[in-house]
């Protein structure tokens, strides 16, 4: 076979390799974009970055004499007709002390509504040391028309906060919640007996 005949074939193979590399790059970028949000969320939960609090299963074994002022903020996003507020606007626990506070939500609409609370701590440097043992934000909340619900939050401030350079001078932190609407079960059809079938969202 002459060099002239082999050249087009070689060029064709090279072009095919380039196409495959481009396709692999496109699919790879798509996969990275899809995974970016959950990976970022995990990163924030592990590091406390961007004011994300920590979820723990056990209480602190160390309690310091120093206290931390903790204030609370409650918000409701459009689409959810709820009143939502903290029972207490602020508390002053000792650092390392486990404490329970309560929030109250009331459905002012004439239909059952489902909400999911999203939380944040400011200043952001305190997020890694704000440990939640129990919180209504771990699950979705359903409220019937006119229903009023008191919801607890159990937390403590990690004593390590006084050792870190970026957080040792923090004396006040704010825990903020925003409730967002979530879709619940929807009536989709009626059977012959007149009862409503419920479709559960997966």
Swiss-Prot record:
Coiled coil: none
Record keyword Iron present: no
Bilayer topology: Single-pass type II membrane protein
UniProt KW Cell inner membrane keyword: yes
Pfam families (alphabetical): CtaG_Cox11
Domain of life (superkingdom): Bacteria
SUPFAM superfamilies linked: Ctag/Cox11
All ranges on the Periplasmic side of the membrane: 38-202
Gene Ontology BP terms: respiratory chain complex IV assembly
Listed transmembrane segments: 15-37
Entry keyword set: Cell inner membrane, Cell membrane, Copper, Membrane, Signal-anchor, Transmembrane, Transmembrane helix
GO molecular function: copper ion binding
One cellular component term from this protein's GO annotations in UniProt: plasma membrane
Subcellular location per the Swiss-Prot or TrEMBL entry: Cell inner membrane
Residues exposed to the Cytoplasmic side: 1-14
HAMAP family, A to Z: CtaG
Chain's role: Exerts its effect at some terminal stage of cytochrome c oxidase synthesis, probably by being involved in the insertion of the copper B into subunit I.
Family per similarity comment: Belongs to the COX11/CtaG family.
Protein name per its UniProtKB record: Cytochrome c oxidase assembly protein CtaG
Organism of derivation: Rhizobium etli (strain ATCC 51251 / DSM 11541 / JCM 21823 / NBRC 15573 / CFN 42)
Lineage of source species: Bacteria, Pseudomonadati, Pseudomonadota, Alphaproteobacteria, Hyphomicrobiales
